[in-house]
């Protein structure tokens, strides 16, 4: 990554949410670098109005303001390819934050080139994974990019000091509409909403009921289950209950329905790439349904060894994304294999949603490898000769028999 003297930096493109941190960063960049700040705000389904970010940026004298609806690109080119892999980090985390960063980094770099900017900037702290994800993504796409990470440079180390800075610099932080300021650090997109900080910093403390925003508690979910039919084409959901939908529409609908049934709540302690453990709570209704349903259609259409190979490679794929290497040779290689495996992953999965649980209750496909004539417990009319199993078992047990014949005790 290239390094420049601050005096040579005249334009900076900032990933800007319009919130407290990035508003302060915008002003800090203007003062510290005496540079023009260009803001970029991405709508990736966070469920909030992004237009207020424009007014806040204008109030700080920012002339070039980019606000973009990236929901479809995010779902189509990032989330859906990841779900073809059934990716889960450390057995539980569906990578909701991890998968959102590459697209933002990509647009930061592209906007910087459009404006001939000297640097990009983000609001990720020096303790988290996001700084790594943003900067690895940026350097992979623009090797000479200069990234300014204020949290690693300034001395504003607490929420109180940030508020004092905002007051001193006449930065308007509008909390209107928030009757109760959340004690949590939250991040949302089409795939999930995350919660960190507050009482969650004690890993033994249970999250408060009023923290959750996207879902009801399973106990309060409807007493009647809801069934959905999800239609797949090459590993991607293309319709719900017969209604053709775009990828981002699929996620919006599944989030809404899943949330009503208490689907997708998660409370975990994860290992960050930077070395520390972190406790976080997540709501991922759509992702939880998508993962279960995708495994359901794959169980019918994927060859056994192809399915097992995917399962073996999945942890590596998930770790690659979690650590910030979406734009990397290894992710591209793994993606090519994964996408090839989805050639015949077509059909329909029927899922049941009930009080926090997702169950696959039916699956069908014209590309099914399930042969009822062979699998039946009834008369198979000679489709499968059970005597063939004797030789199969003998050959597979040969090495074990040889071990035992040499006096080796395999029972220990």
UniProtKB/Swiss-Prot annotation:
Chain positions recorded as ATP binding sites: 15-23, 42, 123
GO molecular function, one term: argininosuccinate synthase activity
Chain sites annotated for binding L-citrulline: 93, 98, 129, 133, 185, 194, 270, 282
Keywords for the protein's UniProt record, in alphabetical order: Amino-acid biosynthesis, Arginine biosynthesis, ATP-binding, Cytoplasm, Ligase, Nucleotide-binding
EC number: 6.3.4.5
GO cellular component: cytoplasm
Single GO BP term: urea cycle
Pathway(s) served: Amino-acid biosynthesis; L-arginine biosynthesis; L-arginine from L-ornithine and carbamoyl phosphate: step 2/3
Binding site for L-aspartate: 125, 129-130
Record family assignment: Belongs to the argininosuccinate synthase family. Type 1 subfamily.
Protein name: Argininosuccinate synthase
């Amino acid at each position: 990554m290239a390094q420049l003297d601050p005096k040579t930096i005249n334009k900076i493109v900032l990933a800007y949410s319009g919130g407290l941190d990035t508003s302060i960063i915008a002003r800090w960049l203007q003062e510290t670098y005496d540079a023009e700040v260009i803001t970029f705000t991405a709508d990736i389904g966070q469920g909030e109005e992004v237009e207020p970010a424009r007014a806040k940026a204008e109030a700080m004298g920012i002339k070039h303001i980019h606000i973009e609806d990236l929901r479809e690109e995010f779902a189509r080119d990032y989330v859906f390819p990841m779900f073809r892999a059934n990716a889960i980090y450390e057995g539980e985390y569906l990578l909701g934050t991890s998968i959102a960063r590459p697209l933002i980094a990509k647009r930061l770099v592209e906007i910087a080139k459009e404006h001939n900017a000297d640097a990009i900037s983000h609001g990720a702290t020096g303790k988290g994974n996001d700084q790594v994800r943003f900067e690895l993504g940026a350097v992979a796409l623009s090797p000479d990019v200069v990234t300014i990470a204020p949290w690693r440079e300034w001395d504003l180390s607490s929420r109180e000091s940030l508020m004092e800075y905002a007051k001193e610099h006449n930065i308007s932080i509008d909390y209107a509409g928030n009757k109760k300021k959340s004690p949590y650090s939250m991040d949302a997109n089409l795939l999930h909403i995350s919660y960190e900080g507050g009482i969650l910093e004690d890993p033994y403390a249970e999250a408060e009921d009023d923290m959750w925003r996207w879902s009801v508690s399973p106990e309060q979910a409807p007493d009647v289950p809801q069934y959905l039919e999800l239609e797949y084409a090459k590993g991607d959901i293309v319709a719900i209950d017969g209604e053709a939908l775009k990828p981002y529409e699929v996620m919006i609908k599944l989030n809404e329905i899943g949330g009503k049934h208490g689907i997708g709540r998660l409370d975990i302690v994860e290992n960050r790439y930077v070395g520390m453990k972190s406790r976080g709570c997540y709501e991922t209704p759509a992702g939880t349904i998508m993962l279960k349903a995708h495994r359901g259609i794959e169980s019918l259409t994927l060859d056994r060894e192809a399915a097992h190979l995917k399962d073996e490679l999945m942890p590596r794929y998930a770790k690659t994304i979690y650590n910030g290497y979406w734009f990397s040779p290894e992710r591209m290689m793994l993606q090519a294999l994964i996408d090839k495996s989805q050639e015949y992953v077509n059909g329909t999965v029927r899922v049941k949603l009930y009080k926090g649980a997702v169950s696959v209750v039916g699956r069908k496909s014209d590309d099914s490898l399930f042969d009822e004539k062979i699998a039946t417990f009834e008369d198979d009319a000679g489709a499968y000769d059970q005597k063939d199993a004797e030789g199969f078992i003998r050959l597979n047990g040969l090495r074990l028999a040889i071990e035992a014949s040499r006096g080796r005790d395999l029972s220990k």
